[in-house]
Amino acid sequence: TIYAIRLQSKRETFYATLAGRRMPTFATAGGRAMLACLDERHADDILRRSRLVPLTPRTLVDPDQIRARIAEARRDGYACVQEESLMGEIVVAAAVVKDRSMPVGAIH
């Protein structure tokens, strides 16, 4: 996942900048939402090739737990993560798809 822009509210201050930064697909709401749009075999192949290194103490790195969250996103049409890529951050994301199936990005 690559973040293009990040807008902060009037009440919150960001202490980390994500714009232009790459984040692991398995640990972000946008990444999981996009993986949920793929067939299970393709998503599993991407997950298998990923370095499952925690970004925070709350990052899921167990492949079965990550697969379960991807399945939830597939069922619900969106993904949620809580403090898995940045502490103090809760993110909800939905994939942006091309031709009704190929994910090309995500809205967080």
Predicted regions mapped to residue ranges:
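Extended hydrophobic
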Residues: 62-108
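Broad hydrophobic/π-residue packing in well-ordered secondary structure
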Residues: 26, 37, 55, 77-78, ...
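Substrate-recognition "cap/lid" segment bordering the active-site pocket of phosphatases
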Residues: 57-61
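Intrinsically disordered, low-complexity polar/acidic regions
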Residues: 55-56, 87
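Short, hydrophobic secondary-structure boundary micro-motifs
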Residues: 45-46, 56, 82
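Amphipathic alpha-helical effector-binding/dimerization core
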Residues: 1-49
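Generic structural signal for secondary-structure transition and capping sites
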Residues: 43, 51-52, 75-79
